């Protein structure tokens, strides 16, 4: 039987960091990040403009916010994108453009080890969420791509506090 408390306990012990590139344009993502922070499931990074996020949402304490436009590591991300995609014909200009894109920026945070994982696709097409990872993160023999929805909270139909995990079987 599925036991979310066991998953939370393991996640807390692992102390991983998850980046949310859609925070600047999705209230659902911000709320999910806050729940993860509050339940101490993982450390949370939002990609977006800090001043806009703080003005729009309350209680973002203990959430790291990184703005690709002003980040100290944006140039490094641009350089890495260019290096990784140069053989495929990417130009320096295109690498720069992609380094400002929240999904590409967050993907590179994972590739660089700043984050351990990324949650995307709530507001962005699956193809646009996966493309950067498939292009930029070197695959490993034991690695895989997974899609899963975890829903916290009181469900309208179920009527009580529940955690639901729903897999996306379209991604294998």
Where are these regions (language model features)?
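Anion-binding alpha/beta catalytic cores of soluble intermediary-metabolism enzymes, centered on
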Residues: 1-172
């Amino acid at each position: 039987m599925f036991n979310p408390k066991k998953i939370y306990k393991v996640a807390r012990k692992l102390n991983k960091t998850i980046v949310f590139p859609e925070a600047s344009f999705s209230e659902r993502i911000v709320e999910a990040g806050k729940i993860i922070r509050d339940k101490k499931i993982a450390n949370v990074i939002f990609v977006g403009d800090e001043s806009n996020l703080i003005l729009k949402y309350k209680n973002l304490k203990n959430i790291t916010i990184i703005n690709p436009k002003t980040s100290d590591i944006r140039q490094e991300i641009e350089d890495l994108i260019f290096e990784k995609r140069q053989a495929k014909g990417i130009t320096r200009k295109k690498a720069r453009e992609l380094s400002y894109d929240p999904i590409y920026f967050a993907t590179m945070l994972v590739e660089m080890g700043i984050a351990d994982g990324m949650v995307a696709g709530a507001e962005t097409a699956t193809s646009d969420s996966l493309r950067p990872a498939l292009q930029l993160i070197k695959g490993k023999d034991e690695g895989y791509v997974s899609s899963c929805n975890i829903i916290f909270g009181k469900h309208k139909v179920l009527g009580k506090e529940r955690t639901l995990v729903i897999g996306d079987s379209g991604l294998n």
